[in-house]
Amino acid sequence: MNWLTNVVRPKIRNILRRETPENLWIKCPDSGHLVFYKDVEANQFVIPGSNYHMRMGAAARLKSIFDNETWYDIALPEVTPDPLKFRDERKYVDRIKDARAKTGMNDAIKVGYGKLEGGAVVVAVQDFDFMGGSLGMAAGEAIVRGIELAVEKQSPFILFAASGGARMQEGILSLMQMPRTTVGVQMLRDAKLPYIVVLTNPTTGGVTASYAMLGDVQIAEPGALIGFAGARVIEQTIREKLPEGFQRAEYLKEHGMIDMVVHRHDLKATLARLCRLLTKAPMPEVIVESEPEPEPEPVVAEIIPPTSDLPVSAPAPAPVAAQTPAPAAPSA
């Protein structure tokens, strides 16, 4: 029994652990139901049934927006990784290394250039998995570089915001990115190019005090948390209970803070339509295929077979020739 307990059973457990992925199932934060990860991934990270919008990585977001799931990654300028030599519980450089290993990104923002329903666009995406999508020098440089490319290509600039605010490990250098990105937005306005912002869950802090709320059109995903300070901080400051749904996308739309709340499945079509309207681009031709006319049904002659019950008509009599009388004999 000792051999079975100490040797065989642990080996079986190790085999089962290796064969079962850690992210095989996802628990829906809204309904609490377990959902198969592959189903969520195939549904653009929207929980089937509850329609809860999960966080979406930068690469998956770009893949869902661009035509044929292809785009050009824009090379971003290098910045000093740790200008203040900051350290709290861990070194700032160690946190950056962990975030890069987790996401495969150099920093919190990824910029791509490609086609959106045939029209050229520049898209910048913040990834919340990279240190909470915080705004630092590298993220600020990425936004400015994306705006400069949009001005160069004369194309709309679309930004997906997802952030907890400015990156505290960079101090005033992080806060400086707020006015820098605001100046970048002004560059788009001077060039008369559309700037569309999609607010995702969550978008808070200094990001909402700068570029995230300066779009020509403000779109939000359903249920997204959007605000500057947290709800608990506001309640403690004003000493009042906040209304239900405060700082959620639907609440902000009802109070005029954003323009529309769009389901993730409809985002691509909505963004393409807005870009065409704001740039006065021609609408794509819609070819309506007319249904072919139905072929006429063949007419089949109905033949009634003769039956013995039908009366048989007698043959018609032959015509009789009219007889002329013989002439009378002449008298003597």
From Swiss-Prot:
Signal peptide: none annotated. Residues 298-332 have a biased composition (Low complexity). Gene3D superfamilies: 2-enoyl-CoA Hydratase, Chain A, domain 1. It comes from Rhodopseudomonas palustris (strain BisB18). It catalyses: N(6)-carboxybiotinyl-L-lysyl-[protein] + acetyl-CoA = N(6)-biotinyl-L-lysyl-[protein] + malonyl-CoA. One of its GO terms (cellular component) is acetate CoA-transferase complex. This is Acetyl-coenzyme A carboxylase carboxyl transferase subunit beta. The keyword Transcription does not apply. The keyword Nucleotide-binding applies. Acetyl-CoA carboxylase is a heterohexamer composed of biotin carboxyl carrier protein (AccB), biotin carboxylase (AccC) and two subunits each of ACCase subunit alpha (AccA) and ACCase subunit beta (AccD). Residues 288-332 are annotated as: Disordered. One of its GO terms (molecular function) is carboxyl- or carbamoyltransferase activity. It is found in: Cytoplasm. The gene is accD. One of its GO terms (biological process) is malonyl-CoA biosynthetic process. HAMAP family: AcetylCoA_CT_beta (MF_01395). Transmembrane segments: none annotated. Its EC number is 2.1.3.15. Belongs to the AccD/PCCB family. Residues 24-293 form the CoA carboxyltransferase N-terminal domain. Keywords: ATP-binding, Cytoplasm, Fatty acid biosynthesis, Fatty acid metabolism, Lipid biosynthesis, Lipid metabolism, Nucleotide-binding, Transferase. Pathway: Lipid metabolism; malonyl-CoA biosynthesis; malonyl-CoA from acetyl-CoA: step 1/1.
